[in-house]
């Protein structure tokens, strides 16, 4: 029987282990035994807490999304202006912890799994909608609504695309370069729509 009060600790250890194993192997075709061994617990205990590998994988992607959401909320609260809010979201999307090799590999594996799993697809759609919505809050204060929608879609696509580039080990792009490219895109479109009225904050 698991020790009383240890469930949150063990569940987190299993989620962290799942992220490492998925990242190391670059696929979701991992076993509960491999994850349990990495977490330092028995497969039986892993099944006790999560029921199945699928449930553990869903908990793992929820953990990634939850961390990203919390970081975004904190960054937006610290922003003083709408333009700073947009920049804060861009920077959060390219934080160093999001660029860890195992995290990049896990995200790519989850995107692949979304072609088969309705729940994984649903969670990734929530992420995409949240990113777009958060960008729009800042952009709507800077340009007309239609333009804000278009800029938000483009910026979100750049964020996802530049992130995927990290999987190309032979052609990496730095965090700062990723931020700068996305900022350049936003700046160019804001200038086109606002005649340079909304300068970018220093990044």
From Swiss-Prot:
Residues 31-50 bind DNA. The keyword Transcription regulation applies. InterPro entries: BetI_C, Homeodomain-like_sf, HTH-type_TetR-like_transc_reg, HTH_TetR, Tet_transcr_reg_TetR-rel_C_sf, Tscrpt_rep_BetI. Keywords: DNA-binding, Repressor, Transcription, Transcription regulation. It comes from Rhizobium meliloti (strain 1021). This is HTH-type transcriptional regulator BetI. It holds the Pfam family TetR_N. Pathway: Amine and polyamine biosynthesis; betaine biosynthesis via choline pathway [regulation]. One of its GO terms (molecular function) is transcription cis-regulatory region binding. Residues 8-68 form the HTH tetR-type domain. Repressor involved in the biosynthesis of the osmoprotectant glycine betaine. It represses transcription of the choline transporter BetT and the genes of BetAB involved in the synthesis of glycine betaine. The keyword Acetylation does not apply. NCBIfam families: betaine_BetI, PRK00767.1. One of its GO terms (biological process) is glycine betaine biosynthetic process from choline.
């Amino acid at each position: 029987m698991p020790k009383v009060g240890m469930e949150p600790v063990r569940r987190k250890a299993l989620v962290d282990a799942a992220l490492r194993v998925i990242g190391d192997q670059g696929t979701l075709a991992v076993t509960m035994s491999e994850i349990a061994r990495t977490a330092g617990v028995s497969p039986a205990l892993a099944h006790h807490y999560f029921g199945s590998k699928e449930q553990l994988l869903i908990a793992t992607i929820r953990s990634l999304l939850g961390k990203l959401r919390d970081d975004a909320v904190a960054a937006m609260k610290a922003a003083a202006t709408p333009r700073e809010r947009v920049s804060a979201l861009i920077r959060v999307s390219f934080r160093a912890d999001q660029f860890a090799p195992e995290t990049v590999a896990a995200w790519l594996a989850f995107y692949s799994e979304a072609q088969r799993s309705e729940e994984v697809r649903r969670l990734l759609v929530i992420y995409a909608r949240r990113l777009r919505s958060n960008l729009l809050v800042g952009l709507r204060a800077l340009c007309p609504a239609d333009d804000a929608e278009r800029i938000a879609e483009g910026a979100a696509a750049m964020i996802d695309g530049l992130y995927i580039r990290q999987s190309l080990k032979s052609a990496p792009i730095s965090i700062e370069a990723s931020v700068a490219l996305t900022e350049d895109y936003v700046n160019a479109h804001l200038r086109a729509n606002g005649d340079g009225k909304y300068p970018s904050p220093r990044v």
